[in-house]
């Protein structure tokens, strides 16, 4: 890991040397009182010490955890009502070095390793705050620019994105094209040296707050297949004809801004093209495994959070003259949950290590995303059940975790598509 990342973490820890808040403060956004604090992230569900992280990662984790405790959790309820987080928290995240961690320093990023990035994914999940779209911005959008952008594009956008002053989004999904990227209808046509962009996108995370959107568009309808006629464009907020529609009111992830985007004869200069013309589908296929690994990591970390919340609850809740935790059926359910979570954590950690060394393939990433997101929904269901009626109350974190989980098997490619990709690799002759 880069020395810059470690030094920044040490500075933040020194500056924030105040005592750790009492247990209830960790979940103060929920309204529930006297809830035990989630244990150290290294020992969630008693799996023992995870061996993929170094002492530097542990130091960094402490600073990330403090950030979410102090800058995110206290404001999350307010953000849920607004349907968006504040721009201020983006800039604070930038100052703390939480954005663009895995982007090389030469490109304006932090220069940390993938596991440092994973620390931020985990800690956000452990905070039970899904509002800030930091991971999409840093680990889905920024890699496209860093990997396929020109020197000018990198220098213009990456430093501002790392600072949290330019919020990024990526616009793939359309009203009639979700997991089927080859069904995209948004198009860009040449006009001299410029491009004219028309179409619409939907369900775009960070869409409302975005300053920069990577737009997937058809540039060659005569290509031998739709995959050979797609390009990526950098569209900046304020461009004439670029219209942000309404913020969408979702079932879960209520603090995360999600929007419709419309493009009506948006004139784009030649340098708005990201990468090569008609290579967009190839770029998407190269980057989607990381997106799916991200979803898997968020999913298993959410499972760990929900398990700890539930274990703490049943150890305190009394029924039939004893704590619920001492009822055999509850113990068996906890045993099942813990086993499933620990086994899945081992697989996701293995995928993280593979991806750190550039060896994670599409099939493995798809398996991780499919399995972990399905488990997340299963764990959410069982944990709400173990909370009884209180689990249905919004003031309890488990209720929010339940509705936030539902989208995980849908975005990033539905789990039905994940099975197709896994099966394709299994039966392939190569």
From Swiss-Prot:
Q: Which GO terms describe its molecular function?
A: flavin adenine dinucleotide binding; long-chain fatty acyl-CoA dehydrogenase activity
Task: Give the residues annotated as active site.
Answer: 291 (proton acceptor)
**Phosphoserine modifications at:** 54-55, 191, 362
Enumerate the subcellular locations listed in this protein's record, separating them with semicolons: Mitochondrion matrix
Q: Which GO terms describe its biological process?
A: carnitine catabolic process; carnitine metabolic process, CoA-linked; fatty acid beta-oxidation using acyl-CoA dehydrogenase; fatty acid catabolic process; lipid catabolic process; long-chain fatty acid catabolic process; negative regulation of fatty acid biosynthetic process; negative regulation of fatty acid oxidation
Enzyme Commission number(s) of this protein: 1.3.8.8
Identify residues that carry N6-succinyllysine. Answer: 66, 81, 165, 240, 254, 279, 322
Q: Which PROSITE patterns does the record match to this protein?
A: ACYL_COA_DH_1 (PS00072), ACYL_COA_DH_2 (PS00073)
The molecule here is called Long-chain specific acyl-CoA dehydrogenase, mitochondrial
- What species does this protein belong to? Mus musculus (Mouse)
Provide the organism lineage as a comma list. Eukaryota, Metazoa, Chordata, Craniata, Vertebrata
């Amino acid at each position: 890991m880069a020395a810059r990342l470690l030094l920044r973490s040490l500075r933040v820890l020194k500056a924030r040397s105040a005592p750790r808040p009492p247990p209830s403060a960790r979940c103060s956004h929920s309204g529930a009182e006297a809830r035990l604090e989630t244990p150290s992230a290294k020992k969630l569900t008693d799996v023992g010490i995870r061996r993929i992280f170094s002492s530097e990662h542990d130091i960094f984790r402490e600073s990330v955890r403090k950030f979410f405790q102090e800058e995110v959790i206290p404001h999350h309820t307010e953000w849920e009502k607004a349907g968006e987080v504040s721009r201020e928290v983006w800039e604070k995240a930038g100052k703390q070095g939480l954005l663009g961690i895995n982007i090389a320093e030469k490109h304006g990023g932090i220069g940390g390793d993938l596991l440092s990035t994973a620390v931020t994914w985990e800690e956000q999940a452990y905070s039970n705050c899904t509002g800030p779209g930091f991971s999409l911005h840093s680990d889905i959008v920024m890699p496209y620019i860093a990997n396929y952008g020109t020197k000018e594009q990198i220098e213009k956008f990456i430093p501002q994105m790392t600072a949290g002053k330019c919020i990024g989004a990526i616009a793939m999904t359309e009203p009639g094209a979700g997991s089927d990227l080859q069904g995209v209808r948004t198009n860009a046509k040449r006009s001299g040296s410029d491009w004219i962009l028309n179409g619409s996108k939907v369900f775009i995370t960070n869409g409302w707050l975005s300053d920069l959107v990577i737009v997937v568009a058809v540039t060659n309808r005569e290509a031998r297949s739709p995959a050979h006629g797609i390009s990526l464009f950098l569209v900046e907020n304020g461009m004439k004809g670029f219209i942000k529609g309404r913020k969408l009111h979702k079932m879960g992830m209520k603090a995360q801004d999600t929007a419709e985007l419309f493009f009506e004869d948006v004139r784009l200069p030649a340098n708005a093209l990201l990468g090569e013309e008609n290579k967009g589908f190839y770029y998407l296929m190269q980057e989607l495994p990381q997106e799916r690994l991200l979803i898997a990591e968020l999913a298993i970390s959410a499972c760990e959070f929900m398990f700890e919340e539930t274990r703490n609850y049943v150890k305190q809740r009394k029924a039939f003259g004893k704590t619920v935790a001492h009822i055999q059926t509850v113990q068996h359910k906890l045993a099942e949950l813990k086993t499933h979570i620990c086994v899945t954590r081992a697989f996701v950690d293995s995928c993280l290590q593979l991806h750190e060394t550039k060896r994670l393939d599409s099939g493995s990433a798809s398996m991780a995303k499919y399995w972990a997101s399905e488990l997340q929904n299963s764990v959410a269901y069982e944990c709400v059940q173990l909370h009884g009626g209180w689990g249905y109350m919004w003031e309890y974190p488990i209720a929010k975790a339940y509705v936030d989980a539902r989208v995980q098997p849908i975005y990033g490619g539905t789990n039905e598509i994940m099975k197709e990709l896994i099966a394709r690799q299994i039966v392939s002759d190569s």
